[in-house]
Design a protein with these regions (language model features):
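Bacterial N-terminal signal peptides that target proteins for export
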Residues: 1-8
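Bacterial N-terminal signal peptides
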Residues: 8-18
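Extracytoplasmic metal-acquisition and chelation regions
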Residues: 23-301
Length: 301
């Protein structure tokens, strides 16, 4: 009798443990880089587990996935990518992900084109740098989660609306910051041409050393072209990005007497303890750095 009770107890315990484990398992989402991951986490809340293939502060254009990346991605039930030729490495990576649906989160965005270099005519992939486009990213992420994890559809739809309100609330303050700078001085000079969408939205004229990070970076011809333009228009500041060398931008500043305004964030978020741990932080910090750099450059002349 005792033995029977013990066996019965063991069966019940095993069933309870199995049920608890199953209940604890969350829908698993993998994203190609940290910015999409942050957006997806805001939409998913506690209903899904979201992680990024690339790490914080990574250069994402020509990232080389590791065996560890592939291992971590195993078991994913959904993959979210940017598209627009951003993740040049992703096609080969995806070959290892059998039967996992992949959703491109830039669907519906009207791309700005790259107008020079070997990528001339291709879409500029940095569409998230427009807060208005950011809202489209969120809608696409929401729709993907609802489609592939319908049990949590209400959660995803509610969280997406809350998050979109937060993004929308940042837009006007960003524009107000830029208005502190005289119109003729509103330039965004950077290493990579990654800020076209932000410059357009905020009324900034754009100038860059190279169009995209997978192109040649900091050649003498690129530096000379920007030096000439900075001198011609008396541009007060130049900037570089967090994932590339600041030497070419500093060289432009040195040769023109322009102010080096600091580091801008675009391709990756920082770690949690860094300056831009979230997408909204990235928009705020990058815009704030541009405005401060321009104003400091004007005061130094």
């Amino acid at each position: 009798m005792k033995k029977t009770k013990l066996i019965l107890f063991g069966i019940i315990l095993a069933a309870f443990t199995s049920t608890a484990t199953y209940a604890a398992e969350k829908f698993k989402v993998i994203t190609t880089f940290t910015i999409i991951a942050d957006m997806a986490k805001n939409v998913a809340g506690d209903a899904a587990e979201v992680s990024s293939i690339t790490k914080p502060d990574a250069e994402i254009h020509e990232y080389q996935p590791t065996p560890g990346d592939i291992k971590r991605a195993q078991g994913a039930q959904l993959i979210l990518s940017n598209g627009m030729h951003l993740e040049t490495w992703f096609k080969r990576f995806y070959e290892n992900m059998k039967n996992v649906p992949e959703v491109t989160v830039t669907t519906g965005i009207v791309p700005m084109g790259i107008t020079e270099g070997p990528y001339n005519g291709k879409p500029n992939p940095h569409a998230w740098m427009s807060p208005d486009n950011g809202l489209i990213y969120v809608d696409n992420i929401r729709d993907a989660l609802v489609k592939y994890d319908p049990e949590n559809a209400d959660t995803y739809m509610h969280n997406a609306e809350v998050y979109k309100q937060k993004i929308t609330a940042t837009i006007e303050p960003l524009r107000e910051q830029v208005e502190k700078v005289p119109v003729e001085q509103r330039w965004l000079v950077s290493s990579e041409g990654a800020f076209s969408y932000l410059a357009r939205d905020l009324g900034l004229k754009e100038l860059y050393l190279w169009p995209i990070n997978s192109d040649q970076e900091g050649t003498p011809q690129q530096v000379r072209k920007v030096v000439e333009q900075v001198r011609k228009y008396h541009i007060p500041a130049v900037f570089s990005e967090s994932t590339v060398s600041d030497k070419p931008a500093r060289q432009v500043a040195r040769e023109t007497g322009s102010h080096y305004g600091g580091v801008l964030y675009v391709d990756s978020l920082s770690s949690e303890n860094g300056p831009v741990p979230t997408y909204i932080d990235l928009l705020k910090v990058t815009t704030g750095t541009v405005v401060k750099g321009l104003l400091d450059g004007m005061s130094n002349k």
